[in-house]
Swiss-Prot record:
Chain segments annotated as transmembrane: none
PANTHER family: ALTERED INHERITANCE OF MITOCHONDRIA PROTEIN 24, MITOCHONDRIAL (PTHR43657:SF1), TRYPTOPHAN RNA-BINDING ATTENUATOR PROTEIN-LIKE PROTEIN (PTHR43657)
Origin organism lineage: Bacteria, Bacillati, Bacillota, Bacilli, Lactobacillales
Natural source organism: Streptococcus pyogenes serotype M6 (strain ATCC BAA-946 / MGAS10394)
Matches recorded under Pfam families: AIM24
Protein name: Uncharacterized protein M6_Spy0233
Signal peptide from the UniProt entry: none
Record SUPFAM superfamilies: TRAP-like
Amino acid sequence: MYQVIHTNKESKMVDNRMRFTIDRSMQFPLVEIDLEHGGSVYLQQGSMVYHTENVTLNTKLNGKGSGLGKLVGAIGRSMVSGESMFITQAMSDGDGKLALAPNTPGQIVALELGEKQYRLNDGAFLALDGSAQYKMERQNIGKALFGGQGGLFVMTTEGLGTLLANSFGSIKKITLDGGTMTIDNAHVVAWSRELDYDIHLENGFMQSIGTGEGVINTFRGHGEIYIQSLNLEQFAGTLKRYLPTSSN
């Protein structure tokens, strides 16, 4: 069942905060977003379940810039990190509704943007207020060279609004207060933008091959980290062992 976790229950409502509810009458509830006239929201491609007639969906190139440069950048990110070239923008010419569902079973965390900004790992993005902004940031190629789990780019938020991130499995929030935390990259959902982080192979390349451990993130400083309880790549590998092959 999908759940929404509010990260700051005491914070005041802001004008551009996303208004959304969870339909809990279903075994796997949907996120339903209320859009006012002229309102918009960015959403994960393929996450739309339904919308009212005054809501329109438009596909946009995923990234900043314009023209050929933006197209080349989107193609390049898609080739090297597996990230989608496109993002969907929903716009409303009146009061409307839009329902979304993540592509994996798990939880949804609502992150309020303003004083706090976040970075998202690959596959964690679900929706973002149209009043907020995001950019795709290139990671140090040495950090992500052997990744396959987070890619060479991460999404970084800017501005005011609400971000919805989704997980595979349950979400746990970790708060760092000047310390250090090492986390398997496949379990990282999102983290505070002000945190320093380093992506590398656990114990080096050969040791990682021998132990089966993959890419890890080491975070330092003050901020929040959201992790997921399940590893999508390991889950896919488990299922693969039971799938028939052409030789069977």
